[in-house]
Amino acid sequence: MSDSDAMTDPNAVSYSNAIVVLCTAPDEASAQNLAAQVLGEKLAACVTLLPGATSLYYWEGKLEQEYEVQLLFKSNTDHQQALLTYIKQHHPYQTPELLVLPVRDGDKDYLSWLNASLL
């Protein structure tokens, strides 16, 4: 969808303040626990857990391969720093994956719900 299409589509919102934070957890139990804590603090409106991820990376000079659960935290820029700080403080990893992706466009009803859920 082009920018001009987004302007004419009544269900699209351009240049929202929504973000998606990517994070991995070592297992489903810790992923569910972290997701529930973040939702309880209203730092994210929704968290999607994607089990079955395999991550390969170097840690302390050694190639590691781990089963992980990918988490997708849906939030907004107003809550971004608090969300990142909270995850870092409550995550079982010493250095958790924390990547922030801006949401450029989206359905206006979903984005309205997302923002209302974070108030």
From Swiss-Prot:
It comes from the Bacteria. Its main location: cytoplasm. GO terms for biological process: response to metal ion. The lineage of its organism: Bacteria, Pseudomonadati, Pseudomonadota, Gammaproteobacteria, Enterobacterales. Cu cation binds at residues 23, 90-91. One of its GO terms (cellular component) is cytoplasm. PANTHER family: DIVALENT CATION TOLERANCE CUTA-RELATED (PTHR23419), FI09726P (PTHR23419:SF8). Disulfide bonds: none annotated. One of its GO terms (molecular function) is copper ion binding. This is Divalent-cation tolerance protein CutA. Keywords: Copper, Cytoplasm, Metal-binding. Coiled coil: none annotated. Pfam families: CutA1. Belongs to the CutA family. It is found in: Cytoplasm. Involved in resistance toward heavy metals. Binds 1 copper ion per subunit. Homotrimer. Its cofactor is Cu cation. It comes from Yersinia pestis. InterPro entries: CutA_Enterobact (IPR023700), Ion_tolerance_CutA (IPR004323), N-reg_PII-like_a/b (IPR011322), N-reg_PII/ATP_PRibTrfase_C (IPR015867).
